[in-house]
Amino acid sequence: MATITREEIKEAIKSMTVLELAQLVKDLEEEFGVSAAAMVAAAPAAGGAAGAAAPAEEKTEFDVILTNAGANKINVIKVVREITGLGLKEAKDLVDGAPKPVKEGVSKDEAEQIKKKLEEAGATVEVK
């Protein structure tokens, strides 16, 4: 039996249609007694379909997004520097480039605290 490299397998898969890929998945599931659905659930950050299923679970990581600096931009820059540890130029660029994430992947409590600080400084903020 000839040995096929992983690269050759990847190239063959790239050339397949969606229907052929679906049939290949079914064949592999039957051959090895596994389920592709279990693999998708184990890696929710892998793609768009897995990301669509995630909202059913309670969210544990949040992104704090500065949508508008408001009229008191200097105070907002100071708060952004305090929260992120960025330098003056980087913090100013972040504030000037709004809407931009200030902090990503934080707990709900931390996200709410950051939002409160930024809003007290005059910024418009949303937590996603």
Curated annotation (Swiss-Prot):
Gene3D superfamilies: 3.30.1390.10, Single helix bin. GO terms for molecular function: mRNA binding; structural constituent of ribosome. One of its GO terms (biological process) is translation. Keywords: Ribonucleoprotein, Ribosomal protein. Homodimer. Part of the ribosomal stalk of the 50S ribosomal subunit. Forms a multimeric L10(L12)X complex, where L10 forms an elongated spine to which 2 to 4 L12 dimers bind in a sequential fashion. Binds GTP-bound translation factors. HAMAP family: Ribosomal_bL12. Forms part of the ribosomal stalk which helps the ribosome interact with GTP-bound translation factors. Is thus essential for accurate translation. This is Large ribosomal subunit protein bL12.
